[in-house]
A protein has these predicted regions:
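A broadly conserved detector of short glycine/acidic/proline-rich loop/turn motifs that flank catalytic sites
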Residues: 66, 76, 110
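Charged, gly/pro-rich active-site loop segments
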Residues: 56, 77-85, 93
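Short beta-strand edge/turn micro-motifs at domain boundaries
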Residues: 71-73, 83, 90-122
């Protein structure tokens, strides 16, 4: 049975964004790339004027996996100011990283928004 907001617990998080409510979800990378393009070119009405943000990362925990990749768990906190309104968003996140020469590539990112009662459209720069 599909979970409805009215009968779900605020302590049970979305596991399947295709079937349950997810505040930000792109089926593939091209959707996210399109959103970034619209923001960079000024074609996204929701981002005029662009917000001022401050992103804080803490409690970083790194675990090397058997295949040489890394699983990185952390907590994040974003402070957001736009149109005379200040807001904050926060939660835990998990990254999967794979080595790429002298650097690392993000192969998966899962950010959980803990204060999910929002007053406006949520976008990726909030996370």
């Amino acid at each position: 049975r599909q979970m409805c907001i009215r009968d779900s617990s605020e302590h049970v998080y979305t596991r399947d964004p295709k079937r349950e409510m997810s505040l930000i979800y792109y089926a593939n990378r091209s959707g996210l790339e399109d959103r970034v393009f619209r923001l960079r070119t000024g074609k996204a009405a929701s981002a005029k004027p662009m917000p001022r943000t401050l992103h804080l990362i803490n409690n970083v925990r790194i675990a090397e996996q058997a295949d040489g990749t890394l699983e990185v768990k952390l907590n994040w906190h974003t402070l957001f100011y736009r149109l005379a309104t200040s807001e904050q968003f926060y939660g835990p996140a998990t990254y999967h990283l794979k080595p790429d020469g002298d650097s690392w590539l993000i192969t998966r990112k899962h950010a959980l928004l803990l204060n999910d009662t929002i007053n406006s459209v949520l976008d990726f720069y909030h996370l």
